[in-house]
Amino acid sequence: MSNWLVDKLIPSIMRSEVKKSSVPEGLWHKCPSCDAVLYRPELEKTLDVCPKCNHHMRIGARARLNIFLDVDGREELGVDLEPVDRLKFRDGKKYKDRLTAAQKQTGEKDALISMSGTLLGMPVVASAFEFSFMGGSMGAIVGERFVRAANYALENRCPMICFAASGGARMQEALISLMQMAKTSAVLARLREEGLPFISVLTDPVYGGVSASLAMLGDVIVAEPKALIGFAGPRVIEQTVREKLPEGFQRSEFLLDHGAIDMIIARSELRPRLGNLLAQMMNLPTPRFVAPVIEPIIVPPAPATI
């Protein structure tokens, strides 16, 4: 073996491997919209909104509730509920196995989390869909957790907010999942009868049985920028009508222009704007919002590839 190979090439390869392994996994994230390579700690400060192009990335249900509700006084509702494979459903894989895999991947028992707490000091109850759990699909547990949150609002005379992110009803639960559309719609009718506000916040994406029920039944319907919202997907519609759809079809901006939703609010503005709106709807004093101080972050040079 030559001296050059021993003295130069092998140490160079070893240094390269050490350098690669010293970069923690998940430290960098590529924006799916503009391909900018973003430093994860910086992205957390912007609530997972790309600082380069303002793309609102998908975030988990628990993270969403944590950034929306006040820190103190949160309590999760329906935490004891777990899904059951009553139909012994199987497609390419057993439903029971799909549930186990989704629970392991997300750390959640099902695709909806509900919490009571406060928003700028005002008592509220909030629910959020976990899209990473089987596409945020709505089954019996999702429906029951939503109903328990609504019942909490009824018992405590407080408003309810839901952050929807779902592909629709859960196929593996068949009619049981479709029944949740009626079940959730019925409890929202009770909220309306009692004069308690329900605000629906549509995030990317909202489709199927969720968009056809609870997601579009808000007293005020809000969406994040550029969220995909519809019943069937745009490709399915194009194949059905055999026509090219308008640019931006099913994006939140398109729906706002056509009167299907009430407003679009950036993620960073949801707390103050919804807090102010709910205070007006509940005839309460305007809450005081203090924007968090964002400490500057020193961003190291981005890697060439991630």
Swiss-Prot record:
* CoA carboxyltransferase N-terminal domain location: 27-296
Q: Where are the zinc fingers (C4-type)?
A: 31-53
Its signal peptide is none
Q: Which domain of life is it from?
A: Bacteria
**Pathway, according to UniProt?**
Lipid metabolism; malonyl-CoA biosynthesis; malonyl-CoA from acetyl-CoA: step 1/1
Major enzyme class: transferase
Q: How is the cofactor bound?
A: Binds 1 zinc ion per subunit.
A Gene Ontology molecular function term for this protein is: carboxyl- or carbamoyltransferase activity
Any Gene Ontology biological process: malonyl-CoA biosynthetic process
InterPro entries in the cross-refs? AcCoA_carboxyl_beta, Acetyl_CoA_COase_Trfase_b_su, ClpP/crotonase-like_dom_sf, COA_CT_N, Znf-ACC
Reactions mediated catalytically = N(6)-carboxybiotinyl-L-lysyl-[protein] + acetyl-CoA = N(6)-biotinyl-L-lysyl-[protein] + malonyl-CoA
Cofactor(s) annotated in UniProt = Zn(2+)
Q: Which UniProt keywords apply?
A: ATP-binding, Cytoplasm, Fatty acid biosynthesis, Fatty acid metabolism, Lipid biosynthesis, Lipid metabolism, Metal-binding, Nucleotide-binding, Transferase, Zinc, Zinc-finger
Any one GO CC term of this protein is: acetate CoA-transferase complex
NCBIfam families, sorted: accD
What family does this belong to?
Belongs to the AccD/PCCB family.
| Functional summary from the UniProt entry | Component of the acetyl coenzyme A carboxylase (ACC) complex. Biotin carboxylase (BC) catalyzes the carboxylation of biotin on its carrier protein (BCCP) and then the CO(2) group is transferred by the transcarboxylase to acetyl-CoA to form malonyl-CoA.
* Designated name of the protein: Acetyl-coenzyme A carboxylase carboxyl transferase subunit beta
